[in-house]
C-alpha cells in the first residue's frame, strides 16, 4: 500500500498525522500538488509537484494509484476514480469513500454544484475540528492495520 495525498487542499494538521503514520509504519507517502509542499526528511515521505491547471494533480494521482493504495482527498470525483481502480479513498474528515457510498456522494456533490450555479449560496464545510482529526486518525490506523 502507498498513500497518495491530494495536497493542494489537505489541511496541515492532517498532513502532520500522515507524516507520523508514514514514519511509524514505513509506508510510502507522496503529497501531490501544483505548488511546492514542505515534507520532513524521511525515506518514506516525498512530494511531487505537478504543473498548475484544473485537475492536474488529481489526474496524476489517478495515473499513479494502484489497487490497494490509499488516497487522501476531499474531492469526490477523484475519490470515485480511485475506487474504480481498486484503491481506497479517505477524506480529511475521516470519511471512508466506498463502492457502496460513492454514488450517493457524487449525486450530492452534483446537486450542490447545481444550487451554487443557480445563485444559491450553500457555504462551505465547517472548519476541521478535533472530532474530525480524531476520526481521520482512527480510520487511517484501521486501513494501515489491514495492509
From Swiss-Prot:
Superkingdom of this protein's organism: Bacteria
InterPro entries linked to this entry: UPF0178
Family matches, as Pfam families: DUF188
UniProt-recorded name of the protein: UPF0178 protein Tgr7_2584
Record family assignment: Belongs to the UPF0178 family.
